[in-house]
Amino acid sequence: MPISTINDSISESSVHKSSIPTKVEMSQNEKYSEAPSEAPTIPPPPEQYAWSRIRENCQDAFSEFFGTFVLLLFGDGVVAQVVLSRGTKGDYQSISWGWGLGVMLGVYVGGKSGGHLNPAVTLANCLFRGHPWRKFPIYAVAQVLGAMAAAAVVYGNYKSAIDAYEGGPGIRTVIGENATAGVFCTYPAEFMTRTGMFFSEFIASTILQFVIFAMADSANIGAGPLMPLGLFFLIFGIGACFGWETGYAINLARDFGPRLVSYMLGYGSEVWSAGGYYFWIPMVAPFFGCAFGGFLYDVFIYTGPSPINTPGMGFGRLVSPRRSTWSNTYNANSPV
């Protein structure tokens, strides 16, 4: 076959192939013979909802609020049951168990924020673990409000029992045989001196923070995921061994919040003056105690990032803090 014939054949074949339609045209009737399928509705991502944005921005405050709320529900609740039943539904060790459970469950609830549940613990984390100082007032306010809300719930739940115990509706006493103010906040034993009151709270708070840092230290044995359970035994131990003299408040939010609620509910100004104006000691001593407990642990045991493990033991940072000191010094998650 001549080359020209072959070329003609190939050319003709190419023409025929190129003439094959690549798109099938549909008539108007065919186009609309079937209803178009609806596209699936995809909900917007959670961050686009207004409440989701609020929850994200206020996550720490909500976590501390509800964590402290749960702590006080169990803590004040067990005191109410033991006191108002006149010891028939529990005893002093029941109170230690109840507070231990309250802390454990509160840490589970408030774990996203670190589960501090205590302004003094938050302070220690700001001082020694790089927790942002700008978050300290947010945590403290949320903790106090959570404690107040829980105290109000406990009061509402036990109001009838309080009336019966006190001797009638509207009778509310702070000191005396039928006093019920101690259900909500702590009052010292009658024999305690002012110095003894302070050091009782100081020592218990020092133990609290020292052991918390030990359990949170991954370079030590550490509690890991069992941290809430470890805190249960820690609080139970403090209550069982150091709680009699002052009631082991060891927490401004736990004491001041319910004390304020009891004042508002009719217990009167004696909630502030009782025990020689004892009310300020649970507000101040835990800060000194937790700071000292954290200091002791970092000086003698801790080897991780801490102002104690810097030149001058962090004193230079205290007298001339850098901006990072007030945001997030170590860029690390704050332990409990």
Curated annotation (Swiss-Prot):
Segments of skewed composition (Low complexity): 9-19
Sequence motif: NPA 2, positions: 251-253
Signal peptide per UniProt: none
UniProt protein name: Probable aquaglyceroporin-2
Family of the protein in this entry: Belongs to the MIP/aquaporin (TC 1.A.8) family.
Region annotation (Disordered) ranges: 1-46
Summary of the knockout phenotype: Leads to no variable phenotypes.
Chemical reaction(s) catalysed: H2O(in) = H2O(out); glycerol(in) = glycerol(out)
InterPro entries: Aquaporin-like (IPR023271), MIP (IPR000425), MIP/Aquaporin (IPR050363), MIP_CS (IPR022357)
Role: Probable water/glycerol channel that may have redundant functions with FgAQP4.
This protein's UniProt keywords: Glycoprotein, Membrane, Repeat, Transmembrane, Transmembrane helix, Transport
Record lineage: Eukaryota, Fungi, Dikarya, Ascomycota, Pezizomycotina
The species this protein was found in: Gibberella zeae (strain ATCC MYA-4620 / CBS 123657 / FGSC 9075 / NRRL 31084 / PH-1) (Wheat head blight fungus)
Gene3D superfamilies: Glycerol uptake facilitator protein
PANTHER family hit by this protein: AQUAPORIN OR AQUAGLYCEROPORIN RELATED, AQUAPORIN-9
